[in-house]
């Protein structure tokens, strides 16, 4: 499966032994070339995460973070605090082609009150979790404006239990929001 291959490549990416910027550039290019076929859709192939075999609706919830935080999350087996009372997740899928990353950051910042979402790189990566019995749906909604001016509504969820089991982490990767 592409997700397993991508996860494997992501965990193999080690730069601690790299001693020069040329080596780092070469290492990153090789890693990028290895994972490119795993993350880019083929001709007439959708990138919608729900069509890649993920469950729909309340089944998958997404955490948006930067890459270093995501890696700490994986290795530590816990969610980061990105909300006043724990971890904020949402049902906004990471391959939403009609929403820009800036708009996603605005919505996350508004929903969480977390100043870190002012920088788009703070939400360039996602982790998808399946643990609906451990989250609370918040009363507010996250309203985003699409690239066509349409109002899109997503639900924020909170988890105060920050530890997670390995099987609850379904996928992770780089977000593919609209550029703009």
Curated annotation (Swiss-Prot):
InterPro entries: Glyco_hydro_41. GO terms for molecular function: beta-glucosidase activity. The keyword Protein biosynthesis does not apply. Transmembrane segments: none annotated. The keyword Ribonucleoprotein does not apply. Keywords: Cytokinin biosynthesis, Glycosidase, Hydrolase. One of its GO terms (biological process) is carbohydrate metabolic process. It comes from the Eukaryota. Its EC number is 3.2.1.-. Hydrolyzes cytokinin glucosides thus liberating free cytokinins. This is Cytokinin-beta-glucosidase 3. It comes from Panax ginseng.
């Amino acid at each position: 499966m592409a997700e397993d291959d991508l996860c494997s490549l992501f965990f193999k990416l080690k730069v601690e032994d790299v001693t020069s910027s040329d080596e780092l550039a070469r290492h990153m290019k090789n890693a990028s070339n290895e994972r490119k076929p795993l993350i880019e859709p083929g001709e007439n192939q959708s990138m919608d995460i729900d069509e890649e075999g993920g469950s729909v609706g309340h089944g998958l919830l997404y955490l948006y973070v930067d890459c270093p935080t995501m890696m700490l999350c994986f290795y530590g087996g816990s969610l980061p605090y990105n909300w006043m009372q724990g971890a904020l997740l949402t049902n906004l899928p990471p391959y939403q082609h009609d929403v820009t990353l800036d708009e996603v950051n605005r919505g996350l910042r508004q929903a969480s009150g977390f100043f870190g979402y002012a920088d788009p790189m703070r939400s360039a990566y996602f982790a998808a979790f399946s643990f609906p019995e451990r989250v609370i749906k918040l009363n507010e909604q996250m309203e985003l404006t699409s690239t066509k001016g349409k109002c899109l509504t997503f639900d924020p969820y909170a988890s105060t239990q920050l530890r997670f089991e390995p099987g609850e982490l379904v996928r992770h990767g780089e977000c593919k929001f609209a550029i703009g």
